[in-house]
């Protein structure tokens, strides 16, 4: 018995049969959807924690030049923390969502 090579396969999509208009229609799908949302939030939170550790390390290593050298990591961290956390689902997206991408004119 050895370890299987490759990455494990996970169900990453929302559950089938969930109706957002009538969530109580299928209780099993409602619970699966709730678990899916919680799982996705935990993934976002853990990604933000990893980026925060990278920013700390970059600040420590770069010293006085951290404003220039760590800017990209800080931007990634700030983008990853927008909308992450509990209770932000019902707030307007403009307050916590990702910033809209600036489209360059041709």
Curated annotation (Swiss-Prot):
Keywords attached to this entry: Electron transport, Membrane, Mitochondrion, Mitochondrion inner membrane, Respiratory chain, Transport
One cellular-component annotation, GO: cytosol
Keyword Isomerase included in the entry's annotation: no
Residue numbers spanned by region Disordered: 1-25
Bilayer topology: Peripheral membrane protein
Main location as per UniProt: mitochondrion
Name of one Pfam family that matches: NDUFB10
GO biological process: photorespiration
Protein's cellular compartments: Mitochondrion inner membrane
Family label: Belongs to the complex I NDUFB10 subunit family.
Function description: Accessory subunit of the mitochondrial membrane respiratory chain NADH dehydrogenase (Complex I), that is believed not to be involved in catalysis. Complex I functions in the transfer of electrons from NADH to the respiratory chain. The immediate electron acceptor for the enzyme is believed to be ubiquinone.
Subunit structure comment from the entry: Complex I is composed of at least 49 different subunits.
Name of the molecule in the record: NADH dehydrogenase [ubiquinone] 1 beta subcomplex subunit 10-B
Organism: Arabidopsis thaliana (Mouse-ear cress)
């Amino acid at each position: 018995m050895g370890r299987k090579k490759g990455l494990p396969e996970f169900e990453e999509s929302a559950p089938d049969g969930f109706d957002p208009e009538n969530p109580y229609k299928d209780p099993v799908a409602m619970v699966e959807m709730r678990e899916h949302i919680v799982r996705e939030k935990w993934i976002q939170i853990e990604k933000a924690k990893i980026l925060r550790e990278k920013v700390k390390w970059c600040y420590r290593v770069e010293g006085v030049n951290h404003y220039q050298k760590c800017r990209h990591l800080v931007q990634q961290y700030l983008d990853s923390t927008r909308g992450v956390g509990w209770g932000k689902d019902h707030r307007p997206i403009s307050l916590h969502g990702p910033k809209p991408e600036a489209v360059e004119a041709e």
